[in-house]
Amino acid sequence: MIDLKNISLNFILSTGRTGSTLLSSMLNMHPEILSVSEEPFAYNLYPKYKNVTNWTDDTIEQFCYDFYLFSEGKLEPQFGKKDDIVKLLKEHQSVLTGEYAIKLAYFAFFPNKDKSQVTTIVDKELKFHHFLNEVADFYPTSKFIILSRDPRDNVLIKIKRAIKKKRVPSTIFLAKTWNYEYTKLIQKTSTLNKNRCLKVKYEDLVEKPAEVLKTITTFLNLPYNDVMLHYDENIKEEVKRNETAIGDTVKQHLSLFHEGLTQKVNTSKVDIWKKELTEAQNNKIWTICKETSTQFGYNSDGCKTISYFKIRMFKDILRFYFDKIIIPNVYYSLPYGLKYAIKKIKYGKNLKNGTWATKDFYKTTLPSK
């Protein structure tokens, strides 16, 4: 049995396109670390199961149902299958609590990884700025790694991603998103014990990876291991090993947006804003993000604070407030029962008759066997 009492649960907090997948992949190479990505069941399932002590077979089945119901669509290719969770839960059925069940769910990820030495879970999340205080209360011993990236590079990478997906990018929308999410992270982590939080810059991670990884493992009370620097070799092996099992959409997604994971860590994507964004774009981004970005150690580097608002930007600004602030804040402030009902109405019909379908954008069904 897994020593669940001594398994620590920790989190990487960031916005998208910050190198968080790179950091998670590096950490996942460590024999004592299990690092998974962007499935926030630790937040979604805790309220319902926190006080459950009598774990019957029906309770286990319901837990698995809820796990899929709340899926964020990021299960493939990192997750195993439903039976993996069921097996883990039944092996520990006599000692289960809500927190233990959630920890065990992590062990169903990366089925090819040897987890015999795992003592530390590191969960990479992009939405915790909405409810970080609740998560910190749910797991009072958890630690938080806040990963940042220069907002100008972050916006540029997101612009490129939007173009690849044949969307029309908005510099204002993306800059305001970076600024809002990191402002919330600063505000909420400031209320926590400083020993629970560690700031890491993407630029430092790729420039001096060994040094940064040593800082992180020390923060997590773990020994440093050089194997973390060889993440690219492991990812190549995993993709090759699972070539027939991984869907075409996943392969395309990995090729488009995570191609760097199959390369050695390098600084080729640092300060690319200086060459690929216009002066006007850089000044807009810096004007919006200046106050927050300086708290993460970024400087103007020639950018100026300007008056940038134009009437034509109103639509993008309005969309930002609705998409990134109003709608999420309304949803996450709802009572748990109402959020659960919304998920059931929207996705519940896909989880009937043992098909365990999910809104996972990589695939349409997750077989029960």
Model-found features: residue ranges?
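PAPS-dependent sulfation machinery
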Residues: 38-124, 128-129
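PAPS-dependent sulfotransferase catalytic domain
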Residues: 109-230, 238-260
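Catalytic beta-strand/loop signature of glycosyltransferases that borders the donor
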Residues: 36-39, 226-228
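A conserved segment at the C-terminal end of the G1
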Residues: 21-32
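PAPS-dependent sulfotransferases, especially Golgi type II membrane carbohydrate sulfotransferases
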Residues: 1-11, 223-369
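ATP-binding Walker
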Residues: 17-18
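Catalytic donor-sugar/metal-binding loop of nucleotide-sugar-dependent glycosyltransferases
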Residues: 31-35, 143
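The Walker A (P-loop) glycine that initiates the GxxxxGKT/S ATP-binding motif of P-loop NTPases
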Residues: 13-14, 124
